[in-house]
Design a protein with these regions (language model features):
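Boundary at the C-terminal end of the N-terminal hydrophobic targeting segment
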Residues: 14, 19-23
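Intrinsically disordered, low-complexity serine/threonine-rich segments
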Residues: 5-8, 399, 432-438, 477, ...
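Mobile, glycine-rich extracellular loop/lid and propeptide segments
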Residues: 22-348, 353-378, 394-420, 443-450, ...
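Pro/Thr/Ser/Gly-rich low-complexity, intrinsically disordered linker/stalk tracts
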Residues: 526-537
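Inter-blade linker and blade-boundary elements of WD-repeat/beta-propeller domains
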Residues: 379-393, 430-436, 489
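Bacterial N-terminal signal peptides
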Residues: 2-15
Length: 537
């Protein structure tokens, strides 16, 4: 690992309106429920976001693809530099950057590559290319360590072909390793499934990838693993680490006596509720249709299911929902695991009863709403979950929904961004508004900015070359406020998109990861911008 304070080449051409507001974005999709909301945004409103007042304010180049969502800390005290708002960017080249969130100036850059290691991979599959470094969104604990900590999982390999998965804890101000890190990810779990040996399945780092964002929950860093390049053997791992020591604290495998069942989730972090339960959607894999007396798979294999994981006393499956045709869906590769899970706020139904719900969707175009207190388990004849909205999305989901003001927003592959209203704790069976634009594979993962319940904007990135940033009125998605193709002379163009992008919207800024850096958007000054570009040398 190396720490670099990089030199900069800065080309100035725009006036940038800045804010001293104190909002942080420390985890994937803004909160552990994964709602994608920032309800403290007072600068960007439907009245202030238009092509004449809003646009690209800079591009912060990096040394690899930015698949992870950029994170943000406000008012960070930097030794010798005063107080700055800081943007944290992780790349597939195994680098983590701390940037001045307004100018893009590099505060520090840390390489997580070990000596003689590389992020190049001879497997050359299309899932994560051309490098295999940092794919998952890190998580920040501002209260831990001397200056706050950013936790990152990095993958690499050496010249002998050995692969490494490591959990790092970096000082948020200095970029240095903390707690004796990094911690090499190793695990085993009782079972006779794929890749097992002597009665245990074994975590083989070359077979796995940490795609889903990290979850910080009650002092634990929870990691969830899927296949590297869809190459067997692999199973479904969830591994927790103590946030203060990086020691492994608990292990769960959700297909220990079968195969597959990876945690893909389009890069979405596992969701958590206020009671400390974790929710995931796993991919096609073994599901035991012989059930115990309490309705659980008799061999502990939960492939292609919506799973609730208890964390008290270690990781364990507390409840689940699987579709009646889960085995057939796995065989046809129409599983749930392509999308992310979201925990909804408590809702009141038509009978006045409080409902504790979560929502997810996968490749079959259904929206599945589950009651977190009784998810529905598996029934051979019909789905037993709280609400099943068939065909509402019109396409497969390789993305994550967002929530705002009793509305759920989904962007299925090849379809428009759609809004589904919630009344009496039930989602509308058809969309209540939709964007005019459609979003090619993999669809879009929206984010929301608002000031409380007012001035809601839904932000979405279109994955194409060049990528397109869209802003919609949250009340009516047919009302587009802005997109980055509207300005003349490619003023707001920002390069090719990535598969699982979600914008970071905070303190008057919008940040979008690309194949070679991060594009910054915000309110424009009186002069039309020509862009600010930061080149790292």
């Amino acid at each position: 690992m190396s720490l670099v304070f990089a030199a900069l080449t800065i080309a100035l051409g725009a006036r940038v309106v800045t804010s001293s507001a104190g909002t942080d974005v420390v985890t994937y999709h803004n909160d552990n429920a994964r709602t994608g909301q920032n309800l403290n945004e007072s600068i960007l409103t439907p009245a202030t976001v238009s092509v004449s007042t809003f646009g690209k304010t800079g591009f912060f180049a990096a040394d690899g693809k930015v698949d992870a969502q950029p994170l943000y800390l406000s008012a960070v005290t930097i030794p010798g530099s005063g107080t700055r708002d800081v943007l944290y960017v992780a790349t597939e080249h195994d680098s983590v950057y701390a940037l001045d969130a307004v100018t893009g100036a590099v505060i520090w850059r840390t390489s997580l590559l070990g000596t003689g290691e590389t992020t190049s991979d001879t497997r050359n599959c299309s899932q994560v290319v051309p490098e295999i470094g940092i794919t998952s969104t890190p998580v920040i604990d501002r209260s831990r360590g001397p200056n706050g900590v950013i936790y990152v999982v990095a993958m690499s390999k050496n010249s002998s072909g050995a692969y490494f998965q490591r959990l790092h804890a970096l000082d948020a101000v200095l970029g240095t390793e903390l707690f004796g890190g990094p911690q090499t990810v190793q695990a085993s779990f009782p079972g006779s499934g794929a890749g097992s040996s002597n009665g245990s399945v074994i975590f083989d780092p070359k077979q796995y990838e940490e795609r889903a964002g990290l979850l910080l929950l009650n002092g634990q860093i929870i990691t969830t693993w899927t296949s590297h390049c869809d190459i067997d053997p692999y199973t479904g791992w969830i591994i927790a680490f103590d946030a203060g020591t990086l020691t492994r604290s608990s292990v769960l495998n959700v297909t220990p006596n079968g195969s597959r069942g990876g945690l893909w989730m389009a890069g979405a972090g596992p969701a958590a509720d206020a009671q400390g339960n974790v929710y995931v959607l796993d991919g096609n894999g073994t599901f035991d249709t012989t059930l115990t007396g309490t309705g659980f798979p008799n061999r502990g294999d939960f492939g292609n299911a919506f799973i609730k994981i208890a964390t008290t006393g270690g990781l364990s499956v507390a409840d689940y929902f699987a579709t009646f045709d889960t085995v057939q869906a796995s065989n046809a590769d129409t599983d749930l695991g392509s999308g992310g899970a979201m925990v909804l706020p408590d809702l009141i139904d038509a009978n006045g009863q409080a409902r504790h719900l979560a929502v997810g969707a996968g490749k079959d175009s259904h929206i599945y709403v589950v009651d977190r207190d009784a998810m529905g388990k598996w029934n051979a004849s019909s789905n037993q979950n709280y609400q099943d909205i068939a065909g509402a999305l019109g396409g497969s989901v390789f993305s994550m929904p967002a929530y705002f003001n009793n509305t759920v927003y989904y962007g299925a592959s090849g379809r428009s961004l759609k809004a589904f209203s919630i009344t009496n704790a039930r989602l509308s069976s058809t969309s209540t508004s939709a964007s005019a634009a459609s979003f090619a594979f993999p669809g879009t993962t929206p984010g929301v900015s608002a000031s409380g319940t007012a001035n809601g904007i839904v932000w979405a990135v279109e994955n194409r070359n060049p990528a397109v940033l869209h802003a919609y009125d949250a009340r009516d998605l047919s009302h587009e406020l802005y997109n980055s193709t509207q300005a003349p002379a490619s003023r707001d163009a920002f390069g090719a998109g990535n598969k699982f992008l979600t914008p970071t919207v905070v303190n008057g800024h919008v940040y979008v990861g690309t194949t070679n850096g991060v594009a910054a958007f915000g309110r424009l000054g009186p002069a039309a911008p020509t862009g600010l570009r930061i080149t790292i040398t």
